[in-house]
Amino acid sequence: MGRNVLLSSLQNASFSIVFQIICRCITFAINAFIVRNVGREVLGITNVRLLLLESTLLFLSKEAIQRSALSSRHNKQCTWAQLINQLWITVPVCFTLAIPCLYIWLHWLSAVDAVYAEQYRFGCFAIAFSCIIEMTAESPIFVGQVFCFVKLKVILDTGHIFIRSFIFITIVLLNKDITIYAFGIAQITSACTIIVGNYAFYYFYIPRLLRYRDELKKVDDKRVLREKYGQQYENMEDFPFVSIRQMLPGVLPNPGSMFNSDLQTLVLSFAKQGILKQVLTEGEKYVMSVSPVLTFSEQATYDVVNNMGSLAARFIFRPIEDSSYFYFTQSISRDTPLAEQRQSAVQEASDVLAYVTKTVTSIGLLAFVFAQSYAGPVLLLYGGADFVEGGLPELLLRWHSLAIVLLALNGITEGYMFATNTSRQIDTYNYYMAFFSVTFLLLSYQLTNWFGPVGFILANCCNMSFRIGYSVFYVGKQFRQVGPNPLLRSLPGPLYLSVLGVCGVLCKLSEAYFAGRSILWHLLVGVLCTAASVASWSFENRQLLRTGMARYRARKQSITTSADER
């Protein structure tokens, strides 16, 4: 198999960053439209309560199965037929989970105003239905991930976001009183788009791949076929499907049992961990929903600020985390000590872990420093004067920038740990996750009573600090047998930290001088200081940038050369 995992991971990260930027820009525009024209209470119902239902169902239904399937496929622990059967379990799992979740969302959580009651009920059922039907696309989505169809994922994800947004905005413009109805309809439509898009691709791809294989036996020069078919059909000798029907359960020939016991054991381990991780990820929304600490209007304010504060996480950190996790699962074996694995792969994984951690930590510090001076102007431009009145949004965004630094470090270190843990280690960590989850919920409730919405952010910082500590200990213990801890090379350099500190002081002086005079000049100072900070980081890490670009070009050239030789 000639596919390159590291190159695919890099491509996936770059394409995903572009997609996340497009997605977040659209979402931010829609949120700003709702805040200015419909009201924050409706935004609180849709973005907090209904999206929490979607997040709960999707995460608990597929996260454990998807992660275990990726690891099992790399280690050749099960057949493709067993993987497909396992992936289709997500449909009945999602349906089963939807029943109690709907009852809780409709009867147990704090009630919405009577004027929105019917729309809210429809929205809950629409979210549940969209999640269930979306699970039917897990099989082709997984195949695309394994065989590195990076552009397919980005195109389909971008397309369904545009379709969902277009339908939602069109309905709201026609009648802004049915915004929640529009939200539910748009969610169902986007789920259908995901299903149709993924299956349609393989409906056309598989027949062309079969013709490509037939012609490949008759020609000596693969360049002729590349000009005719393109590169997406090369190095696909291990693609197991000859019909789109084989992506359905029980259709692909299977000499063994329907399900793999080792895979199911790994699924159970990830499932226990997934429940706890979901509580940690969406804990503040669960607290807001279960206990009426904040009104829907205040929930919307927190959600808007939280999303804005998570720009770096959504644009950069999450795509890098996903690609890094995929790379580590394909490079490092879970059940074999590092000393017994191929040392070139271990060294490469060590370098990737160190460089990626250093990069995201530097980005997090950049966001923290500049948020102290630019939280107010950014929120004013986004939501208007009424939105920032009272100072709560600005205060939340400044505190949230602290969480970004911890989020950056936690995402990579924890991702590496999850990618290389054995089933036993995952089970052990689940006990710690249980402790972290309970502590996080208790801290969220208590700190919110003391500090208001800021308490959610402080509780999240404490939680991530606990998780970072555990991950750092794991990485150090694992690499002790093969060399130095790669995380020791992940701290930003003194030049970058010094320039960043000076720029932070200059921006605070700019804020004090230009406050109420000229936002434009204040923003210009920020742009110049950001450029200086990025330039100092690039200069200090110039060897890293050269190595990364050289390695990327070399691997890309090796793939092209090997393809030409075939």
Feature-to-residue mapping (PLM):
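Signature of the first transmembrane helix
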Residues: 2-66, 93-98, 102-111, 123-126, ...
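Membrane-interface helix-capping segments at transmembrane helix termini in multi-pass transporters
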Residues: 6-7, 38-46, 72-88, 95-132, ...
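Transmembrane helical elements of multi-pass membrane transporters/channels
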Residues: 12-27, 183-202, 214-330, 359-362, ...
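Short runs within selected transmembrane alpha-helices of multi-pass transporters and secretion channels
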Residues: 23, 27-31, 47-54, 58-69, ...
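Helix-loop junctions and terminal segments of transmembrane helices
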Residues: 27-31, 59-77, 146, 305, ...
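Membrane-proximal transmembrane or re-entrant/amphipathic helices at the cytosolic face
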Residues: 58, 205-253, 293, 476-494, ...
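Interfacial segments at transmembrane-helix termini and the short loops linking adjacent helices
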Residues: 106-127, 354, 367-409, 418, ...
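Hydrophobic alpha-helical transmembrane segments
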Residues: 121-125, 154-250, 258, 262-266, ...
